[in-house]
């Protein structure tokens, strides 16, 4: 029986927080700690929190409380760890004074120091070898690749910069090495994430790095090209998330549409537009020219007809009039966005939007969100129906006796739709998790597809 100390782990929040969790767990395993799947089997528990919106704050506080009740020894990290209460003290320590330690996000060193203080590491840290790709919390065939930390924007509805700081880009060589190790470990899809993927390299003035003797600028377009070249060697996909609509995005579209990276740099953009009316965007401190955005979307699709655009929006922002909301609905219809999410505006403690005039009642905010989603789902359904009859490349995520569940290039894991694939009729057509298969699409609803190999 192993005598290695055991650490339980609870990971909450977005994919960027998940990457932080993976880095902490990788370091724990590298030092010889075991990861426990239960509270009672752990010597202590680490909880990685989210603090972006009120619901996430409460979920994190509840998770900390549960860990304290079930285990008693808890270290807290993540975005909520950087959040203050109304009295100015640390929120977590105020609500849960029995926690052993609290750190902010992206704090692997601080977390490990806290773990060492309360659960000394074993004498032989090399008992278990950690794979070069690190410990992953995602399925083996896809992984998130975080290229930077923090954000230079000051959107009025957001408190991320106050928790994660200004933009800090990872060195190109470091990013490429991680990507290569992930592909070597069997990853078939790499999801590039950050708080602001388009701004990669701004903080270091796009300095030139080197990978395998080749110069690569610390810049989104150059990094995507390098990742596309690497993905092509392994027959894999690269998908871009959190792409702020800078002009530089225009340079990435051709990489998706033609040349050696086509089919590897996926024709998929996750662009958080947030709204379409210039006055609302101005109050949000976001780019404020919807007409130019429409022109760019149309231009992107001229260059890359297969492009899928995902976006998120906020309905019921302070001061939003009915006319301004109708402008947003018109934008959704004209832009024909493929995948859309919408939040009813929710005040976030510490956000400057709380100081704006014109706060709308809860029922108005929720009613506008519902109307928005009704229009967005109609647009999405119309676009997805166009895929019926086509044969598409599908990455298989699950397999059972009933068949398989996979995703096309248009579908990111967990947030987009899926393809339900019929069981293979012939042994030669059987598939397993992580396989790419050609699927003829036979049906669709407003969100998902059905097909056969």
Swiss-Prot record:
Offer an example of a GO molecular function term for this protein: aspartic acid methylthiotransferase activity
The chemistry this enzyme catalyses reads:
L-aspartate(89)-[ribosomal protein uS12]-hydrogen + (sulfur carrier)-SH + AH2 + 2 S-adenosyl-L-methionine = 3-methylsulfanyl-L-aspartate(89)-[ribosomal protein uS12]-hydrogen + (sulfur carrier)-H + 5'-deoxyadenosine + L-methionine + A + S-adenosyl-L-homocysteine + 2 H(+)
Q: Which residues bind [4Fe-4S] cluster 2?
A: 151, 155, 158
Entry-linked SUPFAM superfamilies: Radical SAM enzymes
Q: Where does [4Fe-4S] cluster 1 bind?
A: 14, 50, 79
EC? 2.8.4.4
Q: Where in the cell is it found?
A: Cytoplasm
Q: Which GO terms describe its cellular component?
A: cytosol
Gene3D superfamilies assigned to the protein according to its UniProt record, in alphabetical order: Methylthiotransferase, N-terminal domain, Nucleic acid-binding proteins, tm_1862 like domain
Q: Which residues form the signal peptide?
A: none
Keyword Transferase on entry: yes
Say which enzyme class the record assigns: transferase
A GO BP term here is: tRNA modification
Alphabetic keyword roster: 4Fe-4S, Cytoplasm, Iron, Iron-sulfur, Metal-binding, S-adenosyl-L-methionine, Transferase
Q: Which residues form a coiled coil?
A: none
Name the coenzymes or cofactors required. Answer: [4Fe-4S] cluster
Q: Which residues form the Radical SAM core domain?
A: 137-382
- Residue ranges annotated for the MTTase N-terminal domain, each copy included: 5-120
Q: Which residues form the TRAM domain?
A: 385-453
On cofactor binding, the record's note says:
Binds 2 [4Fe-4S] clusters. One cluster is coordinated with 3 cysteines and an exchangeable S-adenosyl-L-methionine.
Its annotated function is as follows: Catalyzes the methylthiolation of an aspartic acid residue of ribosomal protein uS12.
| PANTHER family given in the database record | RIBOSOMAL PROTEIN S12 METHYLTHIOTRANSFERASE RIMO (PTHR43837), RIBOSOMAL PROTEIN US12 METHYLTHIOTRANSFERASE RIMO (PTHR43837:SF1)
Protein name according to UniProt: Ribosomal protein uS12 methylthiotransferase RimO
Lineage of source species? Bacteria, Pseudomonadati, Pseudomonadota, Betaproteobacteria, Burkholderiales
Annotated gene:
rimO
């Amino acid at each position: 029986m192993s005598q290695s100390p055991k650490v339980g782990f609870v990971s909450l929040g977005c994919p960027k927080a998940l990457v932080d969790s993976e880095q902490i767990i990788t370091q724990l395993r590298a030092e010889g700690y075991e990861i426990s799947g239960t509270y009672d089997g752990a010597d202590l528990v680490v909880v990685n929190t989210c603090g972006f919106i009120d619901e996430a704050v409460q979920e994190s506080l509840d998770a900390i409380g549960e860990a304290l009740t079930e285990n008693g020894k808890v270290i807290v990290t993540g975005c909520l760890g950087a959040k203050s209460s109304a009295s100015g003290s640390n929120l977590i320590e105020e609500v849960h004074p029995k926690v052993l330690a609290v750190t902010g996000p992206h704090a692997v060193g601080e977390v490990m120091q806290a773990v060492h203080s309360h659960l000394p590491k074993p004498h032989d840290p090399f008992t278990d070898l950690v794979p070069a790709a690190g410990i992953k919390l995602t399925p083996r065939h896809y992984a998130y690749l975080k290229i930077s930390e923090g954000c230079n924007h000051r959107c009025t509805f957001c408190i991320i910069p106050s928790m994660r700081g200004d933009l800090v880009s990872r060195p190109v060589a470091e990013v490429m090495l991680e990507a290569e190790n992930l592909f070597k470990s069997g990853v078939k899809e790499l999801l590039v994430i950050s708080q602001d993927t388009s701004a990669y390299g701004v903080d270091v003035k796009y300095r030139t790095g080197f990978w395998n003797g080749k110069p690569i600028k610390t810049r989104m377009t150059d990094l995507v090209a390098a990742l596309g070249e690497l993905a092509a060697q392994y027959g894999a996909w690269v998908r871009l998330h959190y792409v702020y609509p800078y002009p530089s995005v225009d340079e990435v579209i051709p990489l998706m549409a033609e040349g050696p990276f086509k089919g590897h740099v996926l024709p998929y953009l996750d662009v958080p537009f947030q709204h379409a009316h210039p006055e609302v965007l101005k109050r949000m401190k976001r780019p404020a020219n919807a007409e130019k955005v429409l022109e760019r979307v149309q231009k992107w699709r001229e260059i890359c007809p297969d492009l899928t655009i995902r976006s998120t929006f906020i309905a019921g922002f302070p001061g939003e009039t009915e006319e301004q909301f109708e402008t947003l609905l018109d934008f959704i219809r004209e832009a024909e966005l493929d995948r859309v999410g919408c939040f009813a505006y929710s005040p976030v403690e510490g956000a400057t939007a709380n100081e704006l005039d014109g706060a709308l009642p809860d029922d108005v905010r929720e009613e506008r969100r519902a109307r928005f989603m009704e229009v967005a789902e109609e647009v999405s359904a119309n676009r997805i129906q166009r895929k019926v009859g086509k044969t598409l490349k599908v990455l298989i995520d699950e397999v059972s006796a009933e068949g398989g569940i996979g995703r096309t290039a248009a579908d990111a894991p967990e947030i987009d739709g899926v393809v339900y694939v019929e069981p293979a009729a012939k042994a030669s057509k059987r598939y397993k998790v992580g396989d790419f298969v050609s699927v003829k699409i036979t049906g669709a609803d407003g969100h998902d597809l059905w097909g056969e190999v």
